[in-house]
Amino acid sequence: MSKTIVLTVGHNVGNNPMFKTSEICDYAADYLGVEAFTASQCFGMWQGEREDSTRIEMCALSDDEAEAIRARVPLLAQVLGQQAIMCEIRPDHVEFIERETVAAIKQA
C-alpha cells in the first residue's frame, strides 16, 4: 500500500532562525534518499514559540519505502540541529500518471 509522508521542519535552532525553505529542501534531498517531493513554507509553534517552518510531502509506493524514509528522519533532525521533526505517515492511494502524446489522445 502506498503512503503519503509529510515532514514539518522548523527553521530555528534554539531561538535563532537558521534555515530557509530552500536550505531545508537541500538537506532533505541529501539525507532522506528521495528523488521527488513537494515543499511549502509555513509557520507553526514549537514549545509555545512561533517559528517559520517547511512542510515536505513525499510519496512512498510501499510500506518498506515509507519506513526507509522515516528511519532517516532522526539523522535529518541531527544535521539540522532540531530537537524533533514532525512526521506524518498516512495510508494513501498514489500513482504516477504519465503523459500521453498528442497523437495517442486524438486516437482515443
Tell what function each PLM region has.
Residues 1-108:
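Positively charged, small/polar-rich N-terminal and surface patches that mediate targeting and assembly
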